[in-house]
Amino acid sequence: MKRRTTAVLTLTALLGTALTALPVQQAGAEEVEQVRNGTFDTTTDPWWTSNVTAGLSDGRLCADVPGGTTNRWDSAIGQNDITLVKGETYRFSFHASGIPEGHVVRAVVGLAVSPYDTWQEASPVLTEADGSYSYTFTAPVDTTQGQVAFQVGGSTDAWRFCVDDVSLLGGVPPEVYEPDTGPRVRVNQVAYLPAGPKNATLVTDATARLPWQLRNAQGTTVARGLTVPRGVDASSGQNVHSIDFGSYRGRGTGYTLVADGETSHPFDIDAAAYRPLRLDSVKYYYTQRSGIAIRDDLRPGYGRAAGHLNVAPNQGDANVPCQPGVCDYTLDVTGGWYDAGDHGKYVVNGGIATWELLSTYERSLTARTGHPAALGDGTLALPESGNKVPDVLDEARWELEFLLKMQVPAGQPLAGMAHHKLHDEQWTGLPLLPDQDPQKRELHPPTTAATLNLAATAAQAARLYRPFDKAFAARALTAARTAWQAALAHPDLLADPNDGTGGGAYNDDDVTDEFYWAAAELYLTTGERQFADHVLDSPVHTADIFGPTGFDWGHTAAAGRLDLALVPSRLPGRDQVRRSVIKAADTYLATLTAHPYGMPYAPAGNRYDWGSSHQVLNNGVVLASAYDLTGAAKYRDGALQGMDYVLGRNALNMSYVTGYGEVSSHNQHSRWYAHQLDPTLPNPPSGTLAGGPNSSIQDPYAQSKLTGCVGQFCYIDDIQSWSTNETAINWNAALARMASFAADQG
């Protein structure tokens, strides 16, 4: 998900009253204190409070916090009018305790006015003894309206919070962030297939070949060889060697690679290694569902109340109005998936995510190595399991029903178009469970891009659900036809790039690719000449659409091209379509071969894009598709090497998939998978893909740690880093598709 800001200070925290207003100290080149009266020697002024009873106790500010609140910011203590200077480094420190122990304080430095940005936050678990806490960050903006706040709500029971020695010191030396990259031998930390490629990367200063050994779980060397020096890798700035141990065909668990005095993280060699990830990557979607209670018996540790069913404090989603001036009706837009780390629901991202899940299933029907039963009925532990419909189709239908609801009703202006998105009026804070979201919900204007996403996915659904539910398939096809005609009538209704308050803009100024994709899906489902003609006449049809950064929600031509190549049809010139996919795969294969980390991804200028992890995987999808078209093992092997990257063979030596690998991402930016901020909440479920390196590092936390980063190092596993570490439904769809392909190769 793309966004510009995430609000994490709320109006509630501003309701307290400051008793005095003291002069503001300006930050300077030397260390300068920005907090006034952080020692509470004789008074609590100018600190304000909200929903606590506070006073002095032994030279500390102590507050009695009521129980029964929901959110951290429901009770708070803070100080406003803090001056911060852009580019200045600050040390935020304090002593704090809690009675009884085990309660959490959310300590934040941010903006006291809209949009309530947060620049530093931490959520320590307090003990009854004073604990000392210190954090360093760099201010991303100039402001005289900063705020230091201690948010102490969200507890069922009453407790006592005490704080002292609060300091925000400007002019301190910036901390140098050094990620712990572990052993210098980088491997796929999950597994390699016995008959598949097996490659690793060694980070070393050596320029000559070095010996390596493959050891089994007992420490016995089972294979050996010499590394291949590759020089300095541009994507990481590291001097590296390659290791190829693909000739070893044994099976087992707990293997390690040893080279240059380093021992890799352990991994397996197992034909069934990817089967759990195939399931977990799709199970992810159940816990993303809106409008339904998540059952703890189906997802232990992730049970929660239904979100956005018009039960207070929710204000949606059963009768959601439009933004002012957009429409005069309301729509029932319950259901669907929450898009990413927020509570928004977006047609364009929902569209590409649904397409990729449906295509994962469709591949199982058409590919020589496909296994339809692998995601069949009963495999995903869903509420719908047991209904004789493949579980992957049950899950995708939850989103499809929402997409259909976003269509403008007949008789209304722009009938047949699809609203672009639905989300909160303002940004909300973290953590926040879906059923506790208090914000007003709004429909945003219909767009051509959203309408064509609906047309494409509904048309695809019509052919795939027909064997299981003819009525739904017919309804989907009718909606797709209606959307297509509406898009033809309104070909240039574009999303406002500035419409990014409360949710991502998802703006797209070129919908030629969406027209092509929708026409392709409608043709593949109906076989009608009108849609074939649009496909063949489109400039997209013969264009080189497979760029270095792959495809995503804003670049959907590949969705149409891949399906035209893979799904049987009588399209004239289909052989040329298939050859274009194979040609693209050859390009990605050349990129992979040249890359010291074996990635089918080399963005221009080494500028890693937002959500780069899923772009690597989608380039792998093209390689996998070429394998399905040709049967050539080189394409299968290339696709599998893309999985190596996301599962640990990378510069940071970590798996970007939660729960998979010795070291994996687990603090993704999310309002309810927020264990880092609230120990009572879970981390993301196993099988959740992190966005991955992003050279633009748009969020303040990443900027404070990663400024000047090189390619693969532009990532940090922290919940505050929404630009490098969010989770999103379209990203996980790429993982699901590739995990399913990999599992089929075992």
Swiss-Prot record:
Q: Hey, what's the signal peptide range on this chain? A: 1-29
Keyword list (alphabetical) reads: Carbohydrate metabolism, Cellulose degradation, Glycosidase, Hydrolase, Polysaccharide degradation, Signal
- Report the residue ranges that make up the CBM-cenC domain in this protein: 45-170
Q: Which PROSITE patterns match?
A: GH9_1 (PS60032), GH9_2 (PS00592), GH9_3 (PS00698)
Task: Please give one Gene Ontology molecular function term for this protein.
Answer: cellulase activity
Region annotation (Linker) maps to 171-211
- The catalytic activity of this protein is classed by the Enzyme Commission as 3.2.1.4
Question: Per its record, how is this protein called by name?
Answer: Cellulase 1
| The species this protein was found in | Streptomyces reticuli
Source taxonomy: Bacteria, Bacillati, Actinomycetota, Actinomycetes, Kitasatosporales
